[in-house]
Design a protein with these regions (language model features):
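Signature of N6-adenine DNA methyltransferases within the class I
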Residues: 26, 30-37, 178-179, 216, ...
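Class I S-adenosyl-L-methionine
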Residues: 72-238, 256, 329-336, 560-585, ...
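Leucine-rich, amphipathic alpha-helical/linker segments
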Residues: 60-76
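Short coil turns linking two alpha-helices in DNA-binding domains
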Residues: 14-17, 202, 272
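Short helix-start
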Residues: 28-53
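Polybasic, glycine- and aromatic-enriched phosphate-binding surface used to engage nucleic acids
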Residues: 15-16, 20, 310, 411-577, ...
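Conserved SAM-binding strand-loop segment of SAM-dependent methyltransferases
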Residues: 245-255
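Polyanion-binding surface elements
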Residues: 1-21
């Protein structure tokens, strides 16, 4: 068996890259012992083959998805090889998309009745708002569904029968079953408590509570989508064998938790608040009046939900939410982090990568306890990519220093890099320029060089130290593009170009005065005494890969990221030696750069 560090050595990748692949679900361990992942020789060989086969040497996430225009089957919602998984593909095959969307309620009612009948509950509980627009006389062609305790089949059905546009507008990213159970199982609480899911969707979190010593009398949910609320009531009935419709109406209420909170205070508030919700101007004005987290230019629904939940949690009570990682990292959410640290203690953070089908949004399962630290508080428990650790209580966590993805050891290395004396910075000592935004790439870009056209660099053309032969060509008409920097930046005799969307710094030097597209941005360093190629070598180094990933944890490389990276000063001779190693010996190059940062060789995380 191989541990993660040994696997990374076998694959010739850095430990930080391996940890990132684990976090994003691109590799899976054979098992976990004492909180550490391990890999069999067979699994390691499979990963090696996948890496060799992957385009551009990048390991791709494996996703088993079926698409129809406007509709998408959420196979990941129920889990791999789940019972009832094949119902949706069968419906897609037998009926048109128009029929399925128009008769969504009738289809839901049909399957709800079947599940209720199997559970020995009255079919009259299958109450949905509105009526199907036509008779569903072809039900004999519909596949059977089987009652599986704890499975949100109706939510899976409803989610897959909505168009992607509607789901996005509603912020409806229903939580996959495995993530629901991971959050529930992570909670160390006395289950004889009052529980609320304020945005319960179809009730998948409430369904998962059936496996806990938790009475249905103590479980409540609220949901603004009337169809989802109806499904949540049916799910609650199935989970707890409830036949009383009045009870179900009371415990699953239709309503908007941002404007009409259910109840006054709760012992546990849990769930997955909507992300990226679209608000009307009238609603935005109302939210800005009532919530501190809505005071900025953009109102983030997840941030406002968290503020609302903090207010309505009992002292000593808990909040357990699925949230975008950005809330913990992005500067615009600094005020929210301040509020969390003022009013609550962070107990746990599970970083789960990208759990939502078709959506790139790294996510975290965050558990807060309202109130001050107790004497028994042992620090924040963190899990990421199958690796677990606890952040020591003495480590300072602030709104600006909210680095939960670092172990204490990694944090110590990070601080060593940050503490470099006499470090140089690109801020105020470099020109930055974005690549050209054409407004219509299909109109402007050609795959063949024609008369009057010239090469243009794209992000995919850039890797560390290297620019591959451009595969796109453009006619240079600066006055006709949607957005363009000053021509002098593109035509500079020497400039650094970098990939804008990337999970690591990828910087190369262009001396051919080439144009760049907006996926490939420009920086022209002007740090006195430092050569451009030397700066390129430092930016591509494993030291700064580690520092950038741990500090910003972003899928995009932004200007302020580059401006904040500490660059070690070096004598002219040392710079020349490092530049020579770019093509001669990358391993020695890394050692020389590490030495400039005054970092020890032993126990390095990169």
């Amino acid at each position: 068996m191989l541990n993660l560090k040994e696997l990374c050595h076998e694959l010739s990748i850095s430990l930080a890259t391996g940890q990132n692949w684990l976090r994003l679900g691109k590799i899976s361990p054979t098992g976990i012992e004492e909180g550490q992942p391990y890999f069999s020789a067979e699994d390691a060989e499979e990963i090696r083959r996948a890496l060799a086969d992957a385009k551009g040497g990048r390991l791709q996430s494996r996703r088993n998805k079926s698409h129809v225009s406007g509709l998408e089957i959420y196979t990941s919602y129920l889990g791999d090889n789940a019972v009832n998984q094949e119902v949706l593909p069968h419906l897609y095959e037998c009926f048109t998309e128009e029929f399925l969307q128009r008769n969504c309620l009738g289809i839901l009612r049909h399957y709800a009745k079947s599940l209720l009948q199997q559970a020995g509950l009255p079919e009259s509980l299958a109450v949905f708002p509105g009526q199907s627009t036509e008779s569903l006389s072809e039900s004999e062609r519909w596949p059977s569904v089987f009652l599986v305790q704890g499975q949100d089949f109706l939510g899976y059905l409803y989610l897959s029968l909505q168009s992607r546009g509607i789901r996005k507008a509603n912020g409806a990213y229903y939580t996959p079953t495995r993530i629901v159970h991971q959050l529930i199982e992570s909670l160390d609480v006395d289950w004889d408590i009052r529980i609320l899911d304020p945005c319960c969707g179809t009730g998948n979190f409430l369904l998962a509570l059936r496996d806990k010593p938790c009475d249905a009398d103590r479980i409540y949910g609220q949901e603004r989508d009337p169809v989802a609320a109806a499904i949540a009531r049916i799910n609650l009935a199935l989970a707890f064998q409830i036949s009383d419709p009045v009870f179900l109406q009371k415990h699953i209420r239709e309503g908007d938790s941002l404007t009409d909170w259910y109840g006054k205070s709760w012992d546990l508030i849990l769930g997955n608040p909507p992300w990226g919700l679209s608000f009307t101007e009238k609603k935005k004005r109302m939210l800005k009046r009532n919530f501190d987290m809505a005071s900025g230019k953009r109102v983030d629904s997840a941030a406002v939900f968290l503020e609302q939940s903090l207010y309505h949690t009992e002292e000593g009570g808990r909040i357990a939410f699925v949230l975008p990682e950005a809330l913990l990292q992005v500067a615009s959410h600094r005020k929210l982090r301040e509020r969390m640290l003022e009013q609550a203690v962070i107990e746990r953070a599970d970083f789960v990568g990208n759990p939502f089908s078709g959506v790139f949004c790294p996510s975290v399962l965050l558990t807060l306890r309202k109130g001050k630290k107790s004497d028994a508080y042992a620090g924040i428990f963190v899990e990421m990519g199958g690796i677990c650790w606890r952040i020591r209580d003495g480590r300072k966590i602030t709104a600006d220093n909210f680095y939960l993805t670092m172990t204490d050891e990694e944090y110590d290395w990070y601080k060593k890099i940050e503490a470099l004396p006499e470090a140089c910075y690109l801020k105020g000592q470099a020109d930055f320029a974005i690549g050209i935004v054409t407004g219509d790439n299909r109109k402007w870009l050609q795959t063949q060089e024609e008369e009057g056209h010239e090469p243009i660099l794209r992000g995919t053309d850039i890797s560390a130290f290297r620019i591959q032969a451009p595969s796109a060509f453009i006619r240079f008409c600066p006055e006709e593009y949607q957005q363009i920097a000053a021509t002098e930046f593109y035509r500079a005799p020497e400039k650094l170009v970098y990939r804008f969307v990337c999970n690591r710094l990828q910087v190369a030097c262009d001396r051919e005065r080439r144009l760049t597209l907006n996926s490939c941005n420009i920086v022209i360093p002007r740090i006195p005494g430092l050569k451009m190629e030397y700066i390129m070598a430092v930016l591509n180094s494993e030291v700064l890969q580690f520092y950038w990933k741990k500090r910003f944890a972003s899928a995009k490389i932004l200007r302020h990221h580059l401006e904040a990276l500490p660059i070690p000063p070096a004598a002219a001779g040392e710079q020349e030696a490092i530049i020579a190693l770019i093509s001669a010996d990358r391993e020695q190059l890394e050692k020389r750069i590490r030495k400039l940062y005054r970092l020890p060789e032993e126990n390095s995380p990169f």
